């Protein structure tokens, strides 16, 4: 099974990707996480990618496509995966279809701009285990202590400020809305209400994927 999660930054794709992947025992591939890992390296590629991220610009198709293709051609992904944040435009979708022939399901997370901004501005994660939190919606049960691993060290993303977030959302709309129209005609396109609670969204996705 190949599942694509589409939606703007802050729509909840990563949270649901991890949950659903665990339930159906498939890898969760998040393009955002992949590039954030690359940025932490001291390479010319990292510097180039970081410049796009800081300005709220999308990373060029040729860079994104090659990174994703290298990942997906690995044998560990031969049985399927959940792909989070890719493709983001028609050019990427057609590149993806050029080397992936299996049937896919596309799930789009529909969320208002106002809620997206609040979700992104408030989010942070445990530096040790990666558990995601939000200052507005999901704080640790004990202040400054991760619910999962007990660590007290958290990571706040430097690219998350309101001006950059608004630009990212607008860039996303320009790039991705034509892709949504393209996938709507595929017969395997589904929309979930991303404004619902985590649990409600998870249930909706399970119904789409026919997970018991």
Swiss-Prot record:
GO CC, any one term: cytoplasm
Protein name: Adenylate kinase
Annotated segments matching region LID: 122-160
InterPro entries named in the record: Adenyl_kin_sub, Adenylat/UMP-CMP_kin, Adenylat_kinase_CS, Adenylate_kinase_lid-dom, P-loop_NTPase
Chain positions recorded as ATP binding sites: 10-15, 123, 132-133, 196
Annotated residues for binding of AMP: 36, 57-59, 85-88, 92, 157, 168
Family as reported in the entry's similarity comment: Belongs to the adenylate kinase family.
GO BP term, example: AMP salvage
Principal subcellular localization: cytoplasm
Taxonomy, superkingdom: Bacteria
UniProt EC number: 2.7.4.3
GO molecular function, a single term: zinc ion binding
Gene symbol of the encoding locus: adk
Compartments where located: Cytoplasm
Pathway assignment: Purine metabolism; AMP biosynthesis via salvage pathway; AMP from ADP: step 1/1
Sequence segments annotated as region (NMP): 30-59
UniProtKB keywords: ATP-binding, Cytoplasm, Kinase, Metal-binding, Nucleotide biosynthesis, Nucleotide-binding, Transferase, Zinc
Assembly mode: Monomer.
Organism: Rickettsia africae (strain ESF-5)
Notes on the domains: Consists of three domains, a large central CORE domain and two small peripheral domains, NMPbind and LID, which undergo movements during catalysis. The LID domain closes over the site of phosphoryl transfer upon ATP binding. Assembling and dissambling the active center during each catalytic cycle provides an effective means to prevent ATP hydrolysis. Some bacteria have evolved a zinc-coordinating structure that stabilizes the LID domain.
Catalytic activity annotation: AMP + ATP = 2 ADP
Binding-site residues for Zn(2+), renumbered to this chain: 126, 129, 146, 149
